Structures are given as C-alpha cells and as structure tokens.
Amino acid sequence: MSHVTLLGLPDDLGNQLSRVLLEESHQASRKLYVSDLRRGPNTCAVFISGDSPDYRQTLSLLREARPGLPVIVVSRQPDAKRWLDALDAGAADYCGAPFEREQLRWIMGSLSSSAKLAAAAPAGAIALAAAARSHG
C-alpha cells in the first residue's frame, strides 16, 4: 500500500478521490498546506486542485520543498487545455472528476514505473562509465 497526500482539495473532490484510491489499495491523507508535508507519513505523490487560481504557485512550492515528488493536478471537469497547462507547469499528471479506478490505477502505475526508472538511472550510468573505463 502506498501513501498519497491530498493537498488543499475541496471536501467533495477529496472524498471522491480518497474513496477510489482506497479501492486501489492506496492510503490517502488530507493536508492543507505544503508545509504540512513535513509531518505525518512519507508520501509517494501529492494531488492538488487545478481549480484553484494559484495551483501553479502550489506546484512551484512543492518542487522547492520536495524535489522529485510527483504532483497530480485534479479538477472537477476534465479539460484538455487544463491538462496541457498542468503538464506545462510541471505536474506529473492530470485527472478530472468523476474519478475512476482504471484512471487512478494507470496514474499510480505510471508514477511507480517512473520512480523505478529514475532509481535505476544512476546505477546504469555508473555501470556504463565503469565499462567504458575498462575498455578504454
């Protein structure tokens, strides 16, 4: 079971998202502020509201506070323009209500795959450098 944080989401969105995440075996906690991420369990991803006018600022604060932590932007209505804007602002992904199990399974799975690739990259680079030195 992984742990995710729902940061500043309105109650209706937070409740819907928590329910579906739990169905997919993810534990969700609710936080109000970026600084609250320092307290409580370690989180593997943060969901924030794209409906908030300052969500880009929240993304920026999260990147400063927790570099590399995936942030998923959520909204009440799926919208292609918002999706592209969220990705452009640095979000790992975007989803809109109503939340579906398959949708969240895919998002959480892609985050897990990305984390595995990132963790393997330094080891692979070290191995390639060592191989190059031994043949050089």
Predicted regions and their residues:
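Conserved phosphotransfer microenvironments
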Residues: 14, 33-68, 75-82
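CheY-like receiver
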Residues: 115-136
